C-alpha cells in the first residue's frame, strides 16, 4: 500500500535509455558492483563539475563511460589534462581499459539531479529551505519546464520535529509514459541531521520512438525485423 512507481524506471525502454548498456552471462554480479563503484567514485571526484549521469557501456576490449555534465571544461581540463588523469585513476580502480566521452548538459536548470544537488548544497550552507526550493522551481519554469515538483523532508530549519514540505508549479503527470519526467533524490547533511530532497521536472512530451543507446537500439531492431526486412536493409 502507498508505494510509488519510480518515474525513470517506469519509462525505461519507452522514452528513456538505460544507464548501464551491457550483457554478461558470467560474472554479472561483479560487473554490476563495478558499475556502482565507478559511479560512486565519479560523483565524488567530479563533485564540482556538475555531473548528472554516467552511462556505462562494455565491450570485450574496454569500458566506455559517457559523462553527462553541465561543466565539461572542468572535467576535460587544460589541454585534456584532467580527463587523462581521471582515465588513469579509473583504469587503476578497475584494471581495465577506459574510454571517456563527455556530453554537455545545455540547460542544467531542467536536470533533476543537478537541481537536487544545488538545493542540497544550499541547505548544507544554511540557506533557507523555502528560498532554495522556490528559486530552483522558478529557474526551471523560466527555462521551459512544463511542471516542477520539489519535496524536502527532515528537521527543516532546525525544527525539533521532522516534517515534509512540498512545492509544485505546473503539470507533473507521473503516469503518462510519453511525458518526459526527470527525477532525482539527494541527501543534505546538516548539523541538525539529514534532509532528503526529491525533485520531479516535467520537460514536455516525447512522441514517437526516441533514439536510445546505440547498442540497445540495434538489439531492438534485430528482434523486430523479419528476415526479408533484414535482407532489404542490407541491400540483398
From Swiss-Prot:
Species this protein is from: Salinibacter ruber (strain DSM 13855 / M31)
Gene Ontology BP annotations: translation
Ranges for domain KH type-2: 38-106
Domain of life from the UniProt record: Bacteria
Protein's name in the database: Small ribosomal subunit protein uS3
Gene Ontology cellular-component annotations: cytosolic small ribosomal subunit
Function (record text): Binds the lower part of the 30S subunit head. Binds mRNA in the 70S ribosome, positioning it for translation.
The keyword Nucleotide-binding belongs to this UniProt entry's keyword annotation: no
Similarity-based family: Belongs to the universal ribosomal protein uS3 family.
UniProt keyword Coiled coil, yes or no: no
Residue ranges of the region described as Disordered: 211-236
Record's subunit section: Part of the 30S ribosomal subunit. Forms a tight complex with proteins S10 and S14.
CDD domains (alphabetical): KH-II_30S_S3
MF (Gene Ontology): mRNA binding; rRNA binding; structural constituent of ribosome
SUPFAM superfamilies tied to this protein: Prokaryotic type KH domain (KH-domain type II), Ribosomal protein S3 C-terminal domain
Keywords: Ribonucleoprotein, Ribosomal protein, RNA-binding, rRNA-binding
